[in-house]
Regions:
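Flexible, glycine-rich terminal cap/loop adjacent to redox cofactors
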Residues: 106-116, 121-218
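A short, glycine/Asx- and small/polar-enriched loop/turn
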Residues: 1, 56-57, 143-148
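Conserved beta-strand-loop-beta-strand element in the redox core of flavoprotein oxidoreductases
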Residues: 1-13, 19
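Active-site-proximal substrate-binding core of FAD-dependent oxidoreductases
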Residues: 85-114
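Flavin (primarily FAD) cofactor-binding/catalytic cores of flavoenzymes
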Residues: 6-9, 54, 115-118
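Short, acidic, Ser/Thr-enriched surface-loop or helix-capping motifs
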Residues: 8, 49-50, 155-156
Length: 218
């Protein structure tokens, strides 16, 4: 098997005798004999409400079997909710997985949260963007990184962050500031100029992307 792709440095080809596909897991609720119970499933996933309770009052479910995210951090959040609700049946709490971030620990790392440009175009949502390359900041320049970037997508009127996508070293760490901004309503203005960024930390690439998005606001 071979694959070819075009890059700024020219065409690149790779050949291999084996292709490893690791693209997620399939729920196996059908192996739990749930048909003999009142627990409802949908496309193999166990259906739960916001408290992680199934269609049977005293039965809770969490993790990969309940949602397609199949991410450890979402399962951790669900586990905290289920643990509380099992111990406190008269004081149930709800799980909140929004916004759902993810990271790919490849080389380079990739991290993402919220909408992509394709999502926003498809939904006809107005947006502005700020894109900063790692090479624009001191740490990235010192690393001689030429392909890493941080992209911030924001509402053109309010500056609310709609999504962010990072590729490069420490992307899985850098994305957290933008997750926090989305979660707590901190827009590009507040995050870019409402705090100081340590120099020459790699976080400056996030600052530059936020500044570019801020400057593009209407």
């Amino acid at each position: 098997m071979s694959i070819s792709c075009e890059t700024p440095l020219g065409d690149v080809s790779h050949s291999s005798e084996i292709l490893l596909v690791a693209t997620g897991r399939t729920p196996t609720a059908d192996e739990l004999d749930l048909d003999s119970t009142d627990v409802i499933t949908d496309c193999g996933y166990i259906v739960t409400d916001e408290t992680m309770r199934t269609s049977v009052d005293d039965v809770f479910a969490l993790g990969d079997v309940t949602n397609p995210h199949q991410l450890k951090h979402s399962a951790n959040a669900e586990a905290r909710v289920v643990s509380h609700n099992l111990i406190n049946p008269d004081n149930l709490i709800s799980v909140d997985l929004d916004p759902m971030p993810y990271a790919i620990f490849s080389n380079p790392q990739i991290a993402s949260v919220g909408a992509t440009e394709e999502d926003l175009l498809e939904s006809q949502t107005e947006y502005v963007k700020g894109v900063a390359e790692f090479s624009e900041v001191a740490y990235g320049w010192a690393m001689e990184n030429t392909d890493g970037f941080c992209k911030v997508l924001a509402c053109p009127h309010t500056g609310r962050i709609l999504g962010s996508h990072i590729m490069g070293p420490q992307a899985s760490t850098l994305i957290h500031q933008l997750i926090q901004g989305m979660k707590f309503g901190q827009g590009v203005k507040e995050l870019s100029r409402g705090m100081l960024y340590v120099h020459p930390a790699l976080n400056e690439v996030v600052e530059v992307a936020l500044l570019k998005a801020k400057d593009a606001l209407h």
